[in-house]
């Protein structure tokens, strides 16, 4: 359960939204993380997810985290744009790490 923080980019591992990138926007009293993606999981109705059902990434969306801590509202369209750019970055980082690991094996 450690490692998650506000603005952290995560990928859903279980449930009907498998594979969907989302952003952690909070935590409820039961230890579940509140995640949004601006589309299937809108800002006004964040999805409660068990931390075991989320795959952590290395990216933190600092603008999202800053807005949350300052108490500013998040906009679904803006959030989708942030997620899209972060998802592309994460995919590139993952491919780079995978290629590096492959080279080390050879």
Which sequence ranges carry the predicted segments?
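Ferredoxin-like alpha/beta domains used as RNA- or RNAP-binding modules
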Residues: 1-6, 13, 23-106
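Short, charged beta-turn/beta-strand-edge "cap" motif at the junction between a beta-strand
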Residues: 15-18
